Amino acid sequence: MHINVSGHHINLTQGMKDAVLNRFSKVESHFPQLDQLSVTLTVGKGERKVDANTLFLGDAVSVQASDDDMYHAIADAAKKLNSALEHRKGVKSSRRS
């Protein structure tokens, strides 16, 4: 899986990139059919926000997480993405054709 990390109003450090790759590689191990993941780190007024977008089984899946600490926001976004993909996997497999 290719993980694209970008920043908005922030200078990305190697530590931030490593944190994103580390956290979201766990999602990759649970869902090997993912091809690409786009993660955007944003700094606003007093908050740090992480947006993650991907395609899973033909549907767009996106999650957002915000926190005072960027590393906590990254961890929350990874957990939310894993949860959203689990939900989407269950919905796709439970529908009758």
Region locations from a protein language model:
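N-terminal, polar/charged subdomain of small-to-medium soluble alpha/beta proteins
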Residues: 1-97
